[in-house]
Amino acid sequence: DSDFRVRSCILYTLLQASGEGHTFLPQEELTAKTSELLGIDKDIIEKNYMDLSIERKIIMKQSGDQTQIYSASFYYMEANTATMLRELDIAYDVADAEIEQRIHNIEKQTGMQLDEHQVQAVKEAVRNGLLVITGGPGTGKTTTINTIIRYFEMEGMDIFLAAPTGRAAKRMSETTGFEARTIHRMLELNGGMEGSAGFERNETNPLETDLVIIDEMSMVDITLMNSLLKAIAPGTRLILVGDINQLPSVGPGSVLKDIIQSEAFNVVMLTKIFRQASTSDIIVNAHKINRGEEVSLDNKSMDFFFLKRYEADIIINVVLQLVKQKLPKFVDATPYDIQVLTPMRKGLLGVERLNGILQQYLNPPDKSKREKEHGDMVFREGDKVMQTKNNYQLKWEICTKFGLTVDKGMGIFNGDMGIITEINDFAETMTVEFDEGRKVEYSYKLLDELELAYAITIHKSQG
């Protein structure tokens, strides 16, 4: 129980907690966890907090009758984030009538019809340097963003759109008709190792734009938020859009939720479910679950079915029928458009077993398809795979069908999905094509970072 060992274990426990999404732990919980790891008395741990605090390795904060203990880096990240948000929160004086007239013109041009909350969101966006727009699925966030984009376009402003994941950025591009990038791409990631990867865009080289709109904010953790804000010069407008009821970020900190709960910034909450969304039982039921109401399970629905089965093998047969026959027939979905989700990794209905079965069924062995065994897994050309950790050094490129490179960059992230297009035993490489046509060549040494993705855990699906 040397002091050095105790202190190292305290810092290790805080680091583990950050991997579970926490920027701090209550003192009692930290003491209990450290004591359990080291098998020593709690008093010995308690007396080391002061020394760590003096060395500025941890920060102790009183909140009500609870002491919260942060690792210093996360504490300062949160404090700096709050300061930078305040600096962006500039008020602009624009007359109501002027904004309303312009909204009316946009509605006429586009055929969109805004409700009062959406109009309020546009007004707040015009009058404030920083705005948060939040609401559940189907509440018109996209229509609101589209109106805001058109409004500022008429002002001749430069607008950047971004989202935390490749898939969210692709979706944002489709719904707005403007190019959206991942936040990492917008900030121009340079390939360091995970801890030291930096961005070319920062406080000394900020983004050259008038307005930044970030979608799917619930997935942004404190580390990425801090990097983003450093790259936004005061005077640039920032609009954050998201749904706080979605799963929080995998990384530490519930940034969106904390910004809203602080009540320090302008927030517009969209609550009305629009007509086209109110015919979607997925959206209606999501709102019911949020309100703690019973979900309607009649299987006349077009998009929400509940099939009750009790034995693992029977459940698997139902899934196989759906994926292979019923869904392709009824909704014209290819097996790659269908995602099977399960809560666990191990067991009869875990990711590992399901992937083996689904692969056998959807992409069976074939003389024309090369494969590569890796641990318990077999990768085969045509397989659907997922990247399982952030790799800032992986190079990708986007090519035309004639092989000309049109774009290239670095970084493939936890949760990115793609298809294996080529396995080359001679070069010991496997090529995977991700969203947006980004192709990456993996050396066989890196195959630990990939897994089959016919079935994935619910936790991984949040991107």
Task: Give the role of each language-model region.
Residues L30, E78-T81, A125, G138, ...:
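Residue-level signature of catalytic and energy-coupling elements of molecular machines
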Residues S35, T110, D221, G356-Q462:
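Conserved nucleotide-binding/hydrolysis modules and their immediate coupling elements
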